[in-house]
C-alpha cells in the first residue's frame, strides 16, 4: 500500500533516532517519490542533522556508535555553554556587519588534513554519483562523444571539454613534506609587498599544472565509445532490466566516472536531464489536475492506478470502469489525458528510458548533487578565516573590506571545486592562490573609476616597483628617461603609463581650511569667453557704433554690409550694389570715401586703442 510523504519521512526520522544515524542509501529509499529536487533533498538532510541524527556514507562500527552515544550529552552541553558565553559577551555590543560575519565564522572549527581529505572524498563521491546517473542517459554519452569528434576535427579545444582524468587505481599520497614546503612558500609570498602581485594566474587555469595528454584522451574516449556501443546493443537485444544489460551499464558508468568534465559541460549534461524531468512533471501534473481537481477523482486512487503505468492508458480505462461518481466525468477529459500520455511516450522514445527510469536517474542525480553541495559548503565555511587573512593585505586599494571578503569567497568556492586531495597538499596552500587571484582581479576591474586592462595594471605595478628601487638608489624621483632605460621600454610608453597610473580626483574636493570652495571652482572653462575678452569686444562694438554714427546713413550701411558689422556675414561689392541699385564701382567709391573719413585722427584715435601691440 502506498504511504503518504509525511508517514515516509516520519518513518525515516524514527529509524534514525533508533539507530543514531542514517546512511544516504536509507534516505534515498525512504524519500517520497515526488521529491526529486536537489534543494529539497538537501533541506531534508539538513533537518535530519539538526535533529541530532548524522547522515553518513555507510553504517559506522558498533564501537564508534557506542562512543558517540556516551559523549553526545557531554558534547551537547559543552556546545550549548560555548554558544551561551559567546552570545552573552557579544549581545548588544555591535551590529557591525564585519564583526557579525566574523563572529558567526568563528563558530566553525578548522579542518585537519584528514578532515579535508574526508570532505574532498565526499565531494568526489557526490560528483561520481551524479556522473554515474548521467551515464545511464544515452543522450549524455552521445553528446560527449560528438563534442570530442569536434575536437578531433579541430573545431573545438580539448580543454573546453575536459580538465583531465581520474585514475581509479591512484593511491592517496599525503606527502607531508610537500605540504609543509607548500605552506611555507605560500606564507612567504603572502608576506611580500603586495604591489608585486602581477595578477597571479591571469586565466582560470591556475590549477592546470599539466596539460591534457591528447593520446591519453584519445585512448579514454575510444574506450568510452566502445563500451557505449556494447551497452546500447545489449539493451536493444535483452532490455534494460536484464542482468547483462545492468552489468554493461555499470561498466559504462565506471568508464564515464574517469572523465573530469569542464563545469560548463557537466552542467549542460545535468541540466539536460533536469529539463527532461521537468517535461515529465509538467505532463504528470496536467494529468493529475484533470483527474483529481477537475473530475474529483480521489488522489489516493489516482496514485495507486497511475504509478508504474505512466505511458499506458490501462489505468485510465480501469478508472472509468470502476463506476464511481467521478468515473463518468473522466470521459470529458479523455482526449486531453491521452494527449498528455502520448507526450510521455514521446519522452520515452527520445531518451530510450521508461518514465520510471527517468525519475530514478534524476532522483539519484539530485541526491549526489545535494551530497556534493553539502560537503563543499562545509569546506568553504571551514576556510573562511583564510579569506579574511588574505583580504586584510589588500585594504586601501579602492574596494571596501567586505567587498574584498566577498570576492575572496568567490575564489575560495572555485578552489573547492578544483581541489585535488590526491596531490598531497593542504587545501589552504592550494586555495591561497585562487583567493589572491579573485581579489586582485576584482581590484583591477572595480577599484578605479575608469577601468584599466589587467596587462596595463601589471605594467603599472612593475613601474612603481622599479621607481621605488631607483628612488632608494639615487635619493630622488627618477625621470621618465631613466625609467625607460631601466625597463627597456620606449620613453613615450613610459610617459603614457605614468599618465594612466594617475588616480581620478573628485571635483567636489574641498580647497582651503574653511572648505567653502571646491576644486571644480578653480578649473578653467575653456568653452566660454574670458571676462577680459568679453569686455574688450563689447567696448569695441560700442566704439564702432559711435564712429559709424558720424558718417552718412548710406556710407554707414555700405561699411556694415561690406565688413559684416552687426550682420551674419559680409557682402561683395556686387551684392551691395544690388541692394542700393547702383553699380559695384559706385559702391567701391562710397566705401573708399567712408574709410578716408574714418582715418581722420578725430575718429581713428578711438579705434586705434583696440589694435594689438
Curated annotation (Swiss-Prot):
Pfam families: Sigma70_ner, Sigma70_r1_1, Sigma70_r1_2, Sigma70_r2, Sigma70_r3, Sigma70_r4. CDD domains: Sigma70_r4. Residues 2-80 are annotated as: Sigma-70 factor domain-1. Belongs to the sigma-70 factor family. RpoD/SigA subfamily. Sigma factors are initiation factors that promote the attachment of RNA polymerase to specific initiation sites and are then released. This sigma factor is the primary sigma factor during exponential growth. Preferentially transcribes genes associated with fast growth, such as ribosomal operons, other protein-synthesis related genes, rRNA- and tRNA-encoding genes and prfB. Interacts transiently with the RNA polymerase catalytic core formed by RpoA, RpoB, RpoC and RpoZ (2 alpha, 1 beta, 1 beta' and 1 omega subunit) to form the RNA polymerase holoenzyme that can initiate transcription. Identified in a complex containing RpoD, the RNA polymerase subunits RpoA, RpoB and RpoZ, CRP and DNA. Interacts with Rsd; this prevents interaction with the RNA polymerase catalytic core and with promoter DNA, and as a consequence, promotes transcription from promoters that require alternative sigma factors. (Microbial infection) Interacts with Escherichia phage lambda antitermination protein Q. This is RNA polymerase sigma factor RpoD. It comes from Escherichia coli (strain K12).
Amino acid at each position: 500500500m502506498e504511504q503518504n510523504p509525511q508517514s515516509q519521512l516520519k518513518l525515516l526520522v524514527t529509524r534514525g533516532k533508533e539507530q543514531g544515524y542514517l546512511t544516504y542509501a536509507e534516505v534515498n529509499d525512504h524519500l517520497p517519490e515526488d521529491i526529486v529536487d536537489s534543494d529539497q533533498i538537501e533541506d531534508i538532510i539538513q533537518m535530519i542533522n539538526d535533529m541530532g541524527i548524522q547522515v553518513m556514507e555507510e553504517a559506522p562500527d558498533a564501537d564508534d556508535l557506542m562512543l558517540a552515544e556516551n559523549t553526545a550529552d557531554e558534547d551537547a552541553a559543552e556546545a550549548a555553554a560555548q554558544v551561551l558565553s559567546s552570545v552573552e559577551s557579544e549581545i548588544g555590543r555591535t551590529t557591525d556587519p564585519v564583526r557579525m560575519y566574523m563572529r558567526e565564522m568563528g563558530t566553525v572549527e578548522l579542518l585537519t588534513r584528514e578532515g579535508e581529505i574526508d570532505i574532498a572524498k565526499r565531494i568526489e563521491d557526490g560528483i561520481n554519483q551524479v556522473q554515474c546517473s548521467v551515464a545511464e542517459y544515452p543522450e549524455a554519452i552521445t553528446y560527449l562523444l560528438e563534442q570530442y569528434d569536434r575536437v578531433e576535427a579541430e573545431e573545438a579545444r580539448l580543454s573546453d571539454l575536459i580538465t583531465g582524468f581520474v585514475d581509479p587505481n591512484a593511491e592517496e599520497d599525503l606527502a607531508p613534506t610537500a605540504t609543509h614546503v607548500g605552506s611555507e612558500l605560500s606564507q612567504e609570498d603572502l608576506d611580500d609587498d603586495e604591489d608585486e602581485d602581477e595578477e597571479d594566474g591571469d586565466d582560470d587555469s591556475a590549477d592546470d599544472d599539466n596539460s591534457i595528454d591528447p593520446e591519453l584522451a584519445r585512448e579514454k574516449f575510444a574506450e568510452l565509445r566502445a563500451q557505449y556501443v556494447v551497452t546500447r546493443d545489449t539493451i536493444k537485444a535483452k532490455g534494460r532490466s536484464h542482468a547483462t544489460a545492468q552489468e554493461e551499464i555499470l561498466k559504462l558508468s565506471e568508464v564515464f566516472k574517469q572523465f573530469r568534465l569542464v563545469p560548463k559541460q557537466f552542467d549542460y549534461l545535468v541540466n539536460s536531464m533536469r529539463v527532461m524531468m521537468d517535461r515529465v512533471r509538467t505532463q504528470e501534473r496536467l494529468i493529475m489536475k484533470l483527474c483529481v481537481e477537475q473530475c474529483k477523482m480521489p488522489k489516493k486512487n489516482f496514485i495507486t492506478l497511475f504509478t508504474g503505468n505512466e505511458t499506458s492508458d490501462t489505468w485510465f480505462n480501469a478508472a472509468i470502469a470502476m463506476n464511481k461518481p467521478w468515473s463518468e466525468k473522466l470521459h470529458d477529459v479523455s482526449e486531453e489525458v491521452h494527449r498528455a500520455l502520448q507526450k510521455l511516450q514521446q519522452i520515452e522514445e527520445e531518451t530510450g528510458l521508461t518514465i520510471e527510469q527517468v525519475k530514478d536517474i534524476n532522483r539519484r542525480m539530485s541526491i549526489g548533487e545535494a551530497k556534493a553541495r553539502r560537503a563543499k559548503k562545509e569546506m568553504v565555511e571551514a576556510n573562511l578565516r583564510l579569506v579574511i587573512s588574505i583580504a586584510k593585505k589588500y585594504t586601501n586599494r579602492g574596494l571596501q573590506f567586505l567587498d574584498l571578503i566577498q570576492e575572496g569567497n568567490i575564489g575560495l568556492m572555485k578552489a573547492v571545486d578544483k581541489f585535488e586531495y590526491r596531490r598531497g597538499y593542504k587545501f589552504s596552500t592550494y586555495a591561497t592562490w585562487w583567493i589572491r587571484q579573485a581579489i586582485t582581479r576584482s581590484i583591477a576591474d572595480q577599484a578605479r573609476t575608469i577601468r584599466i586592462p589587467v596587462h596595463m595594471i601589471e605594467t603599472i605595478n612593475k613601474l612603481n616597483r622599479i621607481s621605488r628601487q631607483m628612488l632608494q638608489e639615487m635619493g630622488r624621483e627618477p625621470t621618465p628617461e631613466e625609467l625607460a632605460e631601466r625597463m627597456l621600454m620606449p620613453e613615450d610608453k613610459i610617459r603614457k603609463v605614468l599618465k594612466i597610473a594617475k588616480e581620478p580626483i573628485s571635483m567636489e574636493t574641498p580647497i582651503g581650511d574653511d572648505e567653502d570652495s571646491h576644486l571644480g571652482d578653480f578649473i578653467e572653462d575653456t568653452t566660454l569667453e574670458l571676462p577680459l575678452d568679453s569686455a574688450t569686444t563689447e567696448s569695441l562694438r560700442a566704439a564702432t557704433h559711435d564712429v559709424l554714427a558720424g558718417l552718412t546713413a548710406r556710407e554707414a550701411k555700405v561699411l556694415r554690409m561690406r565688413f559684416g558689422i552687426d550682420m551674419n556675414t559680409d557682402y561683395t561689392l556686387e551684392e551691395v550694389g544690388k541692394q542700393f541699385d547702383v553699380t559695384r564701382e559706385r559702391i567701391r567709391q562710397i566705401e573708399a570715401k567712408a574709410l578716408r573719413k574714418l582715418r581722420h585722427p578725430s575718429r581713428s584715435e578711438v579705434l586705434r586703442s583696440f589694435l594689438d601691440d
